Amino acid sequence: MAHCRSPFDRFLAMLNVSFRPRSLLAATCLCTIPALSQSQSTTKLTAVERSIASAVDTHNAEALGLLERIVNINSGTLNFAGVRQVGDALRAPLESLGFTTRWVDGAAFHRAGHLVAEHPGPGPKILLIGHLDTVFEPSSPFQRFEKLNDSTARGPGIIDMKGGDVILLYALRALKDAGQLDRMNIVVVFDGDEEESGTPLVAARKALTDAAKGATAALGFEDGAADPRTAVISRRSAGSWDLKTTGFPAHSSQIFKPEVGSGAVYEAARILSEFYTKLSKEPYLTFNPGLVLGGSLVKSDTTGTEGSAAGKRNVVAEHVQVSGDIRTLSPEQQERAKKTMQEIVSHHLPKTSATITFDDGYPPMAPTEGNKRLLAMFDRASRDLGLGTVVAVDPSRAGAADVSFVAGIVPMIIDGIGLSGHDDHSEMETADLRTLPVQTKRAALVLYRLNQGARRSQP
């Protein structure tokens, strides 16, 4: 029986390097991927494509230096000055590549704002998406880039997603060095509030959705599923719901009698039970009641994350509030689920009432045919570079991200092509630095081929 190695082991063995996995996720056994050497496939590249790949290698040390620099800038979402500082660190090199940049002020949605960079050209419009903020505010003890060895580093936001931002930038740099960027029409949006979105959400994502209009393709540089052999072509939504039930307050000895009824708690329990019975088996649909408050008196904050309840064992509960989330794979699935939940809520136990409200939050990104075509291009580019096959991530493992806001606007979308690593959103957030040039080459080559394909198809 063959020894089962981790995704990183198999992937890096393919490139003739070794790596010891540092987390359970990285140690998942995948034993069916055939080995492939770079020398076997790079002959499929044109001279221009080889020059693009070579330019990535030339600037890799510089890219690592920029990564360390911006990781060492605290840019927790609510640290507005830090978010702007990271934006400034990316703004200068973008301008040196010929981009026109502007800062979209975030006062209207209570955040720092966003960096938008535009490079008009004769090619099809392509949107590139990153974000400047992290989950680590200035109060966090996790603040500095730390090189663990030649191939591994730890730091706040190193994979989510400052590494992806650097990959985006140096893919453009490679295209510039190869003499191709001037022929391309690129728009870059670095959101400043991906980790904790501003409100109203429509205002917070207006810069992104405006930039998406007219784009042929969009590439997002999030860190994906901790495996450099995967990319994201579908993401589930991240919405919320709030359920409120009421009952008739009375002595508990009278519960279930016609004049008293069943009480608010039983009504809430009925509804949640029917949600589970009717919807829990549907693929990719999840809904979680994360906070339940019930009793004679209920108080909760506006975020649905905390509250208080008071009641007595011998008093029929008058109020219940339930706050939950809902995740769906497509707009159609989202509407079906909401309709079913509303139908369940509309039927009541005796002497009770109930209402449910929804906040759609982050929309779903369905696995469209266009997204599949773009993944096929990305996979082909990777194989031609000698970097192996790239397959789609199971959407149940792909959380919500800003790229979903351009679904339905842009016909081809791919995400999760940033820096690989593990333990994001924790003080063990760690990157495998060897995937920096790998992902940069893949992205640069796909951008070049998108542009070339459009030029060849013109009459």
Language model segments and positions:
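Acidic/His- and Gly-rich active-site-bordering loop/insert found
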Residues: T43-P156, K176-R183
